[in-house]
Amino acid sequence: RTVLTFTDWKGNKVLERHIIDEKDGVMADTYYVYDALGKLRFVLPPALNDITRSIVKSWDIRSSGALRRYAYFYRYDNRMLLVEKKLPGADPVYYINDITGTPVFCQDGNLRNGNRWKYSIPDRFGRPVLEGLCDAPDAAAVKQKFVHVYKTDFANTASSICGTGYCPNIALKTPSLLTASYYDDYRFLALQQFKGLNRMGSRNARGLKTGTMTAVLEPITSQGDSANNTKTTPSEICSVVSYDNEDRIAC
């Protein structure tokens, strides 16, 4: 099957044409639409060829059912950072980026129905340490700072997010935890959730992931033969990663 690729003067791909049947002139075209700054704004797959080959010069993705079902759409802010993405058949996904351009918050259609956002907060080295859900953040405040975990307190977790020992430099409204990740050392073993877990192997784990705390979204209670045998899954599943002297995972 023949595939033809067309580019503009900047080298951006604007059309990819698959020749399905050369004799009958059957083709499947995918168009790539850019803005004046060269940022990809639309991808129009072959399912939209009836629209793209018509004499109509403009289309509205908000009112065209075909575009909502099949088109890829991307929107950027004045810093050229992605703030909205729409994939075929799905509701838009919104992003809020901090001053470094890191997407800290995002919201898809399902989260929007519950007025919730997903947060992803790194440490000062850019490693993901906190992921979870919260109510609508202060977008203006997020855009003006480098959002990260600025301190850890594993002895007194009252001021940390969901008892993780992590304290970010931005307020989260009604947060819930999905995952917390730990690096470099094993000080987090002081947390109540890690009670009974121990590390083994090398003491030097700098630069390596040493543990995780993952939330159990729907705790399940199993009833045994009697009420005394009732068991409930924990609200978090915790794990510790140990390394040998050559930084290989030991357990």
Where in the sequence are the language-model features?
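Beta-strand elements of repeat-based all-beta scaffolds
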Residues: 1-251
